[in-house]
Amino acid sequence: MDDDHKVSNDISLLPDLNFDSSSPFTSIEFDSSICDLLNLETGGDTPNLIPDHNPFFDSFDGLQEEEEDSHFVVEPESPKVYIAPRVMINHQDSFSLDSRNDEYIEDVKILPGSPGGIQDLGLSRLKVPGSPRAFVHPRSSGSPRFVSPTSPVLIDTAAPFESVKEAVSKFGGITDWKAHKIQTIERRKTVDQELEKIQEDMPDYKKQAVVAEEAKHQVVMELERTRNVVEELKLELEKAEKEEQQAKQDSDLAKLRVEEMEQGIAGEVSVAAKSQLEVAKARHLSAVSELGTIREEIEMVSNEYESLLTEKDLAAKKAEDSVLKAKDVEKQMEGLTMEVIATKQLLELAHATHLEAQEKKLDAAMARDQDVYNQEKELKMVEDEIKRFRQDIDAADDVKTKLKTASALQQDLRAEIAAYKDSNMGKRNNSDIQAAVDSARKELEEVISNIEKANSEVKTLKIIVGSLQSELAREKHDLSETRQRNREDTREEKCTEIAKKLQEASREAEEAKSLAIAAREELRKAKEESDEAKTGLSAVERQLMESKKEMEASRASEKLALAAIKALQETEYANKIEDISSSPKSIIISVEEYYELSKQAHEVEEAANRKLAEIVSKIEVAKEEESRILENLEEVSRETAIRKVELKEAMTKVEKARDGKVGMDHELRKWRSDNGNRSPEGGNKENLSKSKSALHQPTTFTFGEQASSSNVTPQASSSNVTPETETKKKKKRFSLLPKVFMFLSRKKSSNK
């Protein structure tokens, strides 16, 4: 299997040998396409794949007659072959200019059957010339060479390749893979460099885009301005065209009138006078229509002015309401600040009390640890003494038993003495008997004194045991008190939690204070905006007054124009009357005077139009300012509403903090009231010191006082106890045991 994946010049032709070893091996025939494929491009001879002398074939020369039974015979009419995978060589460095050196396509057609039995026959491998640097593609699972013998047979009916170039061109052509790989790497590098350049240029392009947007915006604004200017110029052009037409009409009429006057035509016959009258009538009608439109516009402006006045009054009322609300909010904020200050002071007091409680807790813990250590030490000593006392009691019991035995022996001795007296009355002397009796009496007295001493020692030991039992009871009581102190420590931990809650409440109060400060700033801003709105309203009022004055001036100019029109009408009426009467008293106006009058009327009309336009523009500006002021007032009202909501939230937070503070104060008072009668530093220590001091007196040691001191009830007073008295009482507690030792040593010395 390893040879199949290596670069090799050899391809083994493995015929199907899946038959019995006794079957004859007759011949191997190849299709003509194999020979054609193995030819060189120049048409060289077919290479001899089978050597001339092969011992393998020599051994089977006698079996060539049985060609019908052979499995290796391939008929030329219908050759059934397996197509081995083609190996295409494409290394440019192995090519040369000589066309004969082109690579072979190693296409071997294998006879039907599985390549399995070649090892049994020992067939030598057939070699096909190939390139020394051939690259064999890995075989796929679908290759016909790996198909089982039972699979359907594939028949190659395609025409053979005439040359290697044809085969290569059929399968994609010749390419330089090394150069192609280098080109792809270079392309990738160039693409990466271009990407890096693009990424580096991205911010510059973004800046350019922003600048272009700004320039576009400016150009759009300039376009709008130019449009407005163009519209204004169009209006001015229309006015100029109208004036030019009127001037042309006037000049034509003046020329006609001059010609008629030169010709001597006058009165009704003059065409110029008629046309002049018609023009004057048309102008009069246009002026009347313009006056009507101007009146309508003035009425609209006056209505808008009245609406602006009403809106101004409403805005002023809203501003006053906002100012009042701001003042109320300021008052509320002052109250909140006072409450926040008070809560801060209370929190500081609570923090101080918490610190004091922690200090007391630490002192109590230290004292408790010291007491526990001392009590354990004393308990060990007392246990040792109890063991000794028990040994002494056992010794006393032994003495009692010995005394009983001695009394029994005494009775026996007395009986023996009496018997001896009765028996040996006459034998012994009275002096010897008396001496024996005296010695026996002395022994009895010594035994009796020893018994009395033992009894007294037993009594003293019983008393000491009772005192020690009372001491143990007191120690148990002290242990219970220490447990109670531990419980109080848990309470103190609860107090620390309460202090933490107080700190959280103080933090919330500070947050509420900051919110209140922010609300104050917002109110100040609202006041400033309301002041600005007031100044804007005053400016609008001034502009409205100016517009009123301008309207009055326009009305005056309108009156002047009406008076001029009336004068023109009167002159026209007079001319008509003169024409009708044709009297020589008719007034003839010169052309210059007529031009002057018409010019004055035109100027008056233009002035009225200009004033009306100015009034309209000022009214529009006033409307815009009023709308801006109203928008500002609406924003102020919205902000005040938001600040009100924030103030309500701050008030709720402050109320919650106040409730928490009150609850914490209540819990602190309860804890103080619970721990005031039995503080860990005062009452318990005083009880212990009194119980310890009652065990001894500085001069004598009496068990009656010891017994009476065990029944004394301590009085707790945390204020009267000082550390000096506590240390003295601790020192007095150790004076009991040495006196007991002294008493016992005296007894032992007296016994000796």
UniProtKB/Swiss-Prot annotation:
Polar residues compositional bias, start-end: 690-723
Signal peptide: none
Annotated region (Disordered), positions in chain: 476-495, 653-733
Coiled-coil boundaries: 186-557, 596-651
Phosphoserine found at: 143
Keywords for the protein's UniProt record, in alphabetical order: Coiled coil, Phosphoprotein
Biased composition (Basic and acidic residues): 653-675
PANTHER family xrefs: HEAVY CHAIN, PUTATIVE, EXPRESSED-RELATED-RELATED, PROTEIN WEAK CHLOROPLAST MOVEMENT UNDER BLUE LIGHT-LIKE 2
Family of the protein in this entry: Belongs to the WEB family.
Name of this chain's protein: Protein WEAK CHLOROPLAST MOVEMENT UNDER BLUE LIGHT-like 2
Organism: Arabidopsis thaliana (Mouse-ear cress)
Name of the encoding gene: WEL2
